[in-house]
Amino acid sequence: MDMESNNFQYESEIKWENAGEGVVRQIMAYNDDLMMVKVKFETGAVGTPHTHPHTQATYVESGVFEFTTDGETKIVRAGDGVYMKPGVLHGCRCLEAGVLIDTFSPMRKDFVGRV
């Protein structure tokens, strides 16, 4: 493996990085094949629509979000999930402040380079 995180991650030890207006993220566990990222949104913040070649699965830890993926828009809440196919345009709008747990395969090397 070229890149790999430590075995344990502690929120208090991981730097929050700016990911847009009202959005911050922490890079959690990763290796070449997989990555987990915690993303915190303020109410009204937008995850700008974008594409990437990675498969993405998102778990809504808290809050309420309007997600659009592959041309379909739905409201998701704590406990819900969203799947984004590789190369598909997707984004979200935060309706109530919350946290998303994003997983990517393969890992987002562009994220690790910023930490």
Language-model segment annotations:
Residues V46-G47, E66, V82, P86-G91:
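Histidine-centered metal-chelating micro-motifs
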Residues V37-T51:
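Conserved short histidine dyad/triad with adjacent acidic residue
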